[in-house]
């Protein structure tokens, strides 16, 4: 996501990260990242990542227009998708090499936190699926940043707790962000 943030900053886009896997502009989703992995304690069988970037979409239907945007809608300019992909791949490659060298995200925490849309804002944590939420599966807290493992650090009742993406869905108090 920081790679996308870097590409966005080069295009003069005011993008932010919605932990754990979305990039937003002005409160609307412009990019999503999906991952799937099969692993054991000491062995990864496979990892698959998919990235979708709304590049030149000119409009969204009624159900998405308040939640999604594109580079074109945000800048008024069409983007060359091949150049966008190349810029992202180049930025991602640098971040990935550093991650592999360090073995964790320590080198990126400060930069990520600067791009975090919900930093120092109240968030709602849904433990499980949002649509199945019951009061005992909902927590509220203040997003404080991420740790070296990529967990969102959420302050709940004065105590900071790391929250992993597989456990929750994060929503801002005002809605999606």
Language model feature labels by segment:
Residues 1-13:
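Single conserved hydrophobic/aromatic residue that forms the stacking wall/gate
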Residues 10, 14-42, 52:
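Acidic (Asp/Glu) carboxylate-rich active-site/surface patches
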Residues 29-32, 134-140, 160:
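Short, mixed charged/polar active-site loops
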Residues 42-73:
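Short, acidic (Asp/Glu-rich) active-site segment that either coordinates a divalent metal cofactor
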Residues 74-139, 144, 174-177:
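Conserved, helical-rich catalytic subdomain that frames metal- and/or nucleotide-binding sites
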Residues 152-156:
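SH3/SH3-like beta-barrel fold
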Residues 159-171:
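A short macromolecule-binding patch
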């Amino acid at each position: 996501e920081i790679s996308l943030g870097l590409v966005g900053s080069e295009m003069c886009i005011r993008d932010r990260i919605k932990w754990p896997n979305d990039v937003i502009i002005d409160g609307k989703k412009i990019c999503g990242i999906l991952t799937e992995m099969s692993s054991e304690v000491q062995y990864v069988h496979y990892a698959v990542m998919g990235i979708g970037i709304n590049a030149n979409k000119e409009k969204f239907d009624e159900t998405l227009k308040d939640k999604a945007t594109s580079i074109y809608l945000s800048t008024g300019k069409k983007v060359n998708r091949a150049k966008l992909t190349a810029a992202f791949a180049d930025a991602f490659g640098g971040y990935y090499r550093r991650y592999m060298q360090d073995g964790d995200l320590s080198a990126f925490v400060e930069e990520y936190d600067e791009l975090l849309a919900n930093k120092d804002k109240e968030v709602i944590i849904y433990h499980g699926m949002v649509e199945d939420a019951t009061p005992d599966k909902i927590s509220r807290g203040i997003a404080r940043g991420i740790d070296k493992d990529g967990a969102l650090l959420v302050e709940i009742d004065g105590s900071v707790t790391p929250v992993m993406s597989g456990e929750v869905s994060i929503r801002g108090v005002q809605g999606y962000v």
